[in-house]
């Protein structure tokens, strides 16, 4: 589990694509401290498992499905990525519950500045927007942010300059794709209020007779 509080911005050192997966090597410093092989690190909001450790970087496997369903497919060598280690039991809970399992991809439709904040408008699929509520939490590229406004085609967040400086937001531009993870609490509430219909049992007396029982 993560909290959406980015620990540092790393850079993509290499991307090695195979037939069914890829290996990302990420240059980092802070998140390497006390990290072991098998630990989880969120890379732009996606939970990845460390497979190799180097003095200045770590490597992780990425399945093609993850690449296809996320904005990781847009990364190139040198791309800046937000990094966060999994939250320790005795750690501070500074953001909100982040699973590291993105729901989909959004696109930056607009960026504007006012006296005290930078506003990002994100366009997203209706399947994602159903879980986005005003004043609720959302994770954008691994950053825990508060939704300021919701529109039919997207939503807006207001960020303070400190957040922009400490993440890769300062390198984002209009048209860029970003990973989105909605608040898991909303998903559980929907599941409880609208449970799936029970599956019909296909093991019947007639079927057993046909099979010779």
Sequence positions of predicted segments:
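Conserved loop->alpha-helix
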Residues: 1-213
